[in-house]
A protein has these predicted regions:
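Short glycine-rich anion-binding loops that position phosphate/pyrophosphate groups of nucleotides
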Residues: 33-36, 89-90, 114, 160-165, ...
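Short, well-ordered alpha-helices that flank and scaffold nucleotide-derived cofactor binding pockets
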Residues: 45, 49, 73, 98, ...
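Hydrophobic/aromatic beta-strand patches that form the interior of the parallel beta-sheet core
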Residues: 28-30, 108, 129, 189, ...
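Active-site pre-lysine segment of PLP-dependent enzymes
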Residues: 122, 139-151, 164-188, 192-225
């Protein structure tokens, strides 16, 4: 009898479930933060013509640096910060988990939150700690502080606004948690994938106090631009 083709696949990976997308028939679909409108016909034609002239058969070379420079100008990137681009937030989240893959390392996030925080940690063999939100969907500051003190996570995710609860965290609580993580050398990711739905951005806070955010990544997405 031949050996199982799954023998070298970790058991915890085999026990995981696929990332499921719920049907949205008859609903106003906002959960994926997609642009509900198609491009105007004139823009479609111009875009097709422009893309048709791009040497897609070659690696991007300098084009990636040109794109980074344009994006940095667009968002008025604070001094001392740099941009890292990925194929959607999922790739960046996975790369961060890989970068933090040290024995006993932990990734922490409030829950409910974006499923990929936990999934990327588990795929990489890291510990994941989810901290339940308060009854009003606010951050449970005491529980977050206790979990951070206990586990000293390499990486803490704070979605701003949160997905799926749609709220912005209290700024004072955010500042205290960011400072707590920075005190032992941990990293914080402020995930602003849904920022276009929001009245605020943590980028303003970063600009206001750069020194307090030297260990903070701010993540956004163009997948729904």
């Amino acid at each position: 009898m031949p050996a199982s083709p799954l023998r070298f696949i970790r058991q915890d990976i085999q026990s995981m479930h696929a990332y499921a997308i719920q049907a949205s028939d008859g609903m106003v679909k906002l959960d994926a933060m997609e642009n509900p409108f198609t491009l105007p016909a004139a823009l479609q034609a111009a875009l097709g013509q422009r893309l048709g002239a791009v040497a897609v058969n070659r690696y991007p070379g300098q084009r990636i640096e040109d794109l980074k420079q344009a994006l940095a100008q667009h968002i008025d990137l604070p001094p001392g910060y740099a941009l890292m681009l990925g194929n959607g937030s999922d790739e960046l989240i996975a790369l961060l988990a890989m970068a933090c893959d040290m024995p006993g390392a932990t990734i922490l996030a409030p829950e409910p939150g974006f499923v990929m925080y936990a999934m990327s940690a588990r795929l990489q063999g890291l510990n994941f700690v989810g901290v339940p939100l308060a009854a009003n969907f606010a951050l449970d500051e005491a529980a977050m502080q206790a979990a951070i003190a206990l586990h000293q996570p390499a990486l803490v995710y704070l979605a701003y606004p949160n997905n799926p609860t749609a709220n912005l965290w209290d700024a004072q609580v955010m500042r205290r948690l960011i400072a707590q993580v920075g005190a032992y050398g941990g990293l914080v990711v402020v995930d602003e994938a849904y920022q276009p739905f929001s009245s605020g951005t943590w980028l303003d806070e970063i600009r206001r106090d750069l020194s307090a955010h030297s260990h903070v990544f701010l993540m956004r997405t163009l997948s729904k631009f």
